[in-house]
Swiss-Prot record:
UniProt GO BP: translation
Quaternary structure and interacting proteins, as annotated: Part of the 30S ribosomal subunit.
Species annotation: Lachnospira eligens (strain ATCC 27750 / DSM 3376 / VPI C15-48 / C15-B4)
Pfam family, one: Ribosomal_S10
Protein name: Small ribosomal subunit protein uS10
Molecular function per GO: structural constituent of ribosome; tRNA binding
UniProt xrefs under InterPro entries: Ribosomal_uS10, Ribosomal_uS10_CS, Ribosomal_uS10_dom, Ribosomal_uS10_dom_sf
């Protein structure tokens, strides 16, 4: 596992929650002796939905809602088996989606 890289992608709607999770992942990886690159903030996806307030007429009266998806990228360089076990057993708060990918 010396030349491998673990690429961790985090997604969440709350930017504070994703930053706390990234910090926890970095601390865990550094405790096991691996080198860490990141967190790299990726572009935020903004989804806007417009709905009519009234049912029949009053088309000028509309309401907009938005949902922002924040993303972070963390690379763990030269991980050991101990690092992989620690990262897979790490508990994250609800609302944070984690994708672990092992690359050569």
């Amino acid at each position: 596992m010396a030349n491998q890289v673990i690429r961790i992608t985090l997604k969440a709607y709350d930017h504070q929650l994703i930053d706390q999770s990234a910090k926890k992942i970095i601390e865990t990886a550094k405790k096991t002796g691996a080198q860490v690159s990141g967190p790299v903030p990726l572009p935020t996806k903004k989804e806007v939905v417009t709905i009519l307030r009234a049912v029949h007429k009053y088309k000028d009266s509309r309401e907009q809602f938005e949902q922002r998806t924040h993303k972070r990228l963390i690379d763990v360089l030269s991980p050991s088996q101990k690092t992989v076990d620690a990262l897979s057993k790490l508990e994250m708060p609800a609302g944070v989606f984690i994708n672990l990918k092992v690359m050569n």
